[in-house]
Amino acid sequence: MHEMSIALSIVDAVVAKARQEGGVRISAIDLLIGKLAGIEPESLKFCFSAAARETLAAEALLNIEEPEGVGECGECGMSFPVNFYYAECPRCRSLRVKIVSGEEFLIQSMTIEEEGE
């Protein structure tokens, strides 16, 4: 389950940034995880809840946006939705398809609370 190592990395990154900013608690974390990134969002949420225990992120709400996969044909230039890494262009049937969206994985933002909030 690689989601646990990903969850631990997220916790490390957000806690370090929150401390740098003088935060005492993280209330929300917004992630962008493309549907082709190979990460199961529900597993990540489960692992995150375990990884965040006893940290500034222990009560953080994990919001995950999942952009669809998009491919672009290297022959005719058509862009189209893809669900797998290997796709055929629906227009010209070429297999020269480049994935242009759906592999993203990043921490978009987080909400840090300061003392007294």
Curated annotation (Swiss-Prot):
Ni(2+) binds at residue 2. One of its GO terms (molecular function) is nickel cation binding. This is Hydrogenase maturation factor HypA. Keywords: Metal-binding, Nickel, Zinc. Zn(2+) binds at residues 73, 76, 89, 92. PANTHER family: HYDROGENASE MATURATION FACTOR HYPA (PTHR34535:SF3). Belongs to the HypA/HybF family. One of its GO terms (biological process) is protein modification process. Involved in the maturation of [NiFe] hydrogenases. Required for nickel insertion into the metal center of the hydrogenase.
